[in-house]
Amino acid sequence: MEPFTNDRLQLPRNMIENSMFEEEPDVVDLAKEPCLHPLEPDEVEYEPRGSRLLVRGLGEHEMEEDEEDYESSAKLLGMSFMNRSSGLRNSATGYRQSPDGACSVPSARTMVVCAFVIVVAVSVIMVIYLLPRCTFTKEGCHKKNQSIGLIQPFATNGKLFPWAQIRLPTAVVPLRYELSLHPNLTSMTFRGSVTISVQALQVTWNIILHSTGHNISRVTFMSAVSSQEKQAEILEYAYHGQIAIVAPEALLAGHNYTLKIEYSANISSSYYGFYGFSYTDESNEKKYFAATQFEPLAARSAFPCFDEPAFKATFIIKIIRDEQYTALSNMPKKSSVVLDDGLVQDEFSESVKMSTYLVAFIVGEMKNLSQDVNGTLVSIYAVPEKIGQVHYALETTVKLLEFFQNYFEIQYPLKKLDLVAIPDFEAGAMENWGLLTFREETLLYDSNTSSMADRKLVTKIIAHELAHQWFGNLVTMKWWNDLWLNEGFATFMEYFSLEKIFKELSSYEDFLDARFKTMKKDSLNSSHPISSSVQSSEQIEEMFDSLSYFKGSSLLLMLKTYLSEDVFQHAVVLYLHNHSYASIQSDDLWDSFNEVTNQTLDVKRMMKTWTLQKGFPLVTVQKKGKELFIQQERFFLNMKPEIQPSDTSYLWHIPLSYVTEGRNYSKYQSVSLLDKKSGVINLTEEVLWVKVNINMNGYYIVHYADDDWEALIHQLKINPYVLSDKDRANLINNIFELAGLGKVPLKRAFDLINYLGNENHTAPITEALFQTDLIYNLLEKLGYMDLASRLVTRVFKLLQNQIQQQTWTDEGTPSMRELRSALLEFACTHNLGNCSTTAMKLFDDWMASNGTQSLPTDVMTTVFKVGAKTDKGWSFLLGKYISIGSEAEKNKILEALASSEDVRKLYWLMKSSLNGDNFRTQKLSFIIRTVGRHFPGHLLAWDFVKENWNKLVQKFPLGSYTIQNIVAGSTYLFSTKTHLSEVQAFFENQSEATFRLRCVQEALEVIQLNIQWMEKNLKSLTWWL
């Protein structure tokens, strides 16, 4: 998507700019697609659909008591507050009758208000009269020469606001920010001053930028040729989070100017923007901390700025703090000065050119451990009592930094690299340039309580955020429609780097599992292309989903495999060198690949079939003699005819790889490109079987003819290790997904996993457990307990030998240790063998030692879950959660607490986390997902979400990853039409923006698919079991 450009002549000041009434190709018509932008975390305002004429200052929130009663009644009756008509609202006061024979006399206040309304109405009518005519339909205006496009908005002071687009104009661009902040961590307020050097690219009177929640006290303007500061008028349009600085003189193209804005604001109580919180240290003393989380749209809440990724600039940051605190920002500290009042002012060096969402600063009590790496000082920060848990992160960061510098052939450009573990942080981590922020659990590692999965998590997250220093920071997408360029590349490099320098962690197993789950999401009708047009805040937030991260990275894996690792690296290095410190779009990446391939392959044409279409292909293979007949169509889980894609609407350019019997993987991998609906591959000889999509490096599902499926099933029975563990897991995944679609009998899927008694690798076993667990959950939640029990018994018989071989230790390779965790959790969850007895003995001994006895870290979660089944065990775990300092151990305890079958305990857990009591609100989505995984918690989780929806969307932005997880985690196991209707009715009664959320549509579709799966497979499952 191209950034918004304004190449129109600027009208004289205080007049409406013509450009705001013309639609840009990438701008949504707000008469049809309004942006519902959250103004503050605790005050979300919505305007009625199609209305852009909100006039503030007219007492729009001042309802009479009768009107408030009507509002309450309307909500009780299920009426949508946003869709009520003004006629209904006025009728609430229509029942007030005057005494008989008397005429009511309007008060002076009423007459003044009426006169003001009349003036505003006349102004609006004049504006509309002077604009091009439009006949509005349900869909809005479509013809540019007949449409007003966007109706002129009003500023908060009632004046016309000179800009109506969500995107900022490009008539003025920032060059440098000088930001000074003085936070008060006791009152949770701050004072700020920002001086912005800008350049005018076109003649204009107005400078439009972002600002939300600021009490602006003074704005001055100065041109580069004059040293005289002049007062400037400021207008605010809070609906878009924008302010307009009306300059005292025209800004001339090519000239530089300086704005200075002085303001004050509250430190946010949510997790977005410049936010603060308190925590209790190991001495039970209350401590205060402030940090930032600006991505994607929250820098504007910390300081007025041009808050779009393409508006890159440099930053000089000063922070005034109390002496006991440490202040950090993106760049190294330049100086510290003690002020007259005893406060300290830290000034940081001027930054490199970067986007606003990457700006960061932290104030709190911290300690650090550091190491120099070729002139860059790498430091890991944590609160003082947890500094002993940063050693692994430092060692890992040093190795990864050296690897990325060598691979990208570009040195990390800053003199320091800080990684900070923040006690209360909602995101997993954030890649702020030079100041990476993390949850404690994703950065700290305690060898006594952190499992192999914990170690792998810390390593992956550090790798991901370091990769962002090049992909996202050095080279940045122009707009959020191409977020996948940031997140897809960082995710790909995360796994790629681990395979190179931490090969023992077998991170490919995690990447494979992530691809399986992402493809399940991408097979829904509610999916979206990874490069999608976005405008509103909700749409931007929704781009932060598994498709941007894992589909994006999966496509890069497929491309690397097809082109070769050397060609791929050469293209990536060229891309980074060509676009350093710039803003780019997808075509710039593909152009680099085309340059490296010398146009022998049109990479851009090939990859656009993957980035601009939602979904992925189903490749159907039939072997006849020495030929493979191939066809492609979209893999689509929903079988309803009315939403089936047409056969001609989807076509991908698919790199097809395959291996046959007796062929060595490294020498005999064959690759072809299918860029048509069907094709034929000639084999050198007749073979018994063929496995397409080697190691699942391609982003597609493969369906074989009946005989070919049977040949593969037979091969797994006689010798599964002819195929790689990735391919065995791939076959399990594909056949169960096809069975759900009805392409393969469910019996055949279970026939394929009959070989599992001979399987000893993690990926195939965990994928089989995942697929059968989905079926178990559907059966259990619908009350088919006998069938569910028989299913578990059958799976247990297949894996009985492997389960009995497991020891309750932390011995073995990382992959073996993770397999042990999965197998023992399966056995104890379903009370199979002597698993629960052994776990309970370990728990009792641990509890008797008051939690001081060491437990094997890889089975700790399973032990805690078994122990939490008793009231005494649950209460003991709760006490330990509150008192211990290891985040790794706390997470294991929390999962056990949330796995209880006691609904009172579960409700208390969710409520406590929502309120931030005992459990931080950052844990809430994890708690809801865990509660929703079990019976009867899945019903309770949904009830809790319904009851507290308004509070949830106040704490977390609408469309955010947290809201996505909460909606999915509380509904994904519903499989009845009653629940479908209930979920749909609930969200229909929320705001229109809420119902349109992709995660809501996905939740409804998943419930429909669960119903569809049961209707299609229940009978055959009953017969087979």
From Swiss-Prot:
The record marks 154-155 as: Cleavage. Glycans are attached at residues 145, 184, 215, 256, 266, 368, 374, 448, 525, 578, 598, 664, 682, 760, 834, 850, 989. Residues 132-1025 are extracellular. GO terms for biological process: antigen processing and presentation of exogenous peptide antigen via MHC class I, TAP-independent; cell-cell signaling; female pregnancy; negative regulation of cold-induced thermogenesis; peptide catabolic process; protein catabolic process; protein polyubiquitination; proteolysis. Binds 1 zinc ion per subunit. The modification Phosphotyrosine is found at residue 70. Release of an N-terminal amino acid, cleaves before cysteine, leucine as well as other amino acids. Degrades peptide hormones such as oxytocin, vasopressin and angiotensin III, and plays a role in maintaining homeostasis during pregnancy. May be involved in the inactivation of neuronal peptides in the brain. Cleaves Met-enkephalin and dynorphin. Binds angiotensin IV and may be the angiotensin IV receptor in the brain. This is Leucyl-cystinyl aminopeptidase. It comes from Homo sapiens. The gene is LNPEP.
